[in-house]
UniProtKB/Swiss-Prot annotation:
Motif interval(s): Involved in PIP2 interaction: 84-100
Species of provenance: Olea europaea (Common olive)
Subunit record text: Occurs in many kinds of cells as a complex with monomeric actin in a 1:1 ratio.
SMART domains given in the database record: PROF
Post-translational modification: Phosphorylated by MAP kinases.
GO molecular function annotations of the record: actin monomer binding
CDD domains named among the record's database cross-references: PROF (cd00148)
Function (record text): Binds to actin and affects the structure of the cytoskeleton. At high concentrations, profilin prevents the polymerization of actin, whereas it enhances it at low concentrations.
SUPFAM superfamilies documented for this protein: Profilin (actin-binding protein)
Disulfide-bonded cysteines: 13-118
Sequence similarity: Belongs to the profilin family.
Protein name: Profilin-2
Length: 134
């Protein structure tokens, strides 16, 4: 399966039990900031934004004072899982980023998708990739 198929079929799909509800944007990005696959709607990000995200995985709490920035959008960092998941909130939407051995699985959402639904979609694929050694 191609990386694009993972994004299209496992991230940008309808949320279980909620036909028509799906993430706004999603991507799989290497730890070096290279995009493996992304939805057409995923924002263009700057290398320093990705560096900040990777630093927060290695030093949990790094982004808390400044917020998480991606594609010029600032998200308030909310409770995640140190070294494994970063979650951010902006208005009625937000972002979930799950770190695997080689990649970051990113999902961005807006209402009516809930934070919990975004977490479930992103973390399920991230956990699967971890199980596959990726």
């Amino acid at each position: 399966m191609s990386w694009q198929a993972y994004v299209d079929d496992h991230l940008m799909c309808d949320i279980e039990g909620h036909e028509g509800h799906r993430l706004t944007a999603a991507a799989i990005i290497g730890h070096d900031g290279s995009v493996w696959a992304q939805s057409a709607t995923f924002p263009q990000f700057k290398p320093e934004e990705m560096n900040g995200i990777m630093t927060d995985f290695n030093e949990p709490g790094h982004l808390a004072p400044t917020g998480l920035h991606l594609g010029g959008t600032k998200y308030m960092v909310i409770q995640g899982e140190a070294g494994a998941v970063i979650r951010g909130k902006k208005g009625s939407g937000g972002i979930t980023i799950k770190k695997t051995g080689q990649a970051l699985v990113c999902g961005i959402y807006e209402e009516p998708v809930t934070p919990g639904q975004c977490n479930m979609v992103v973390e399920r694929l991230g956990d699967y990739l971890l199980e596959q050694g990726l």
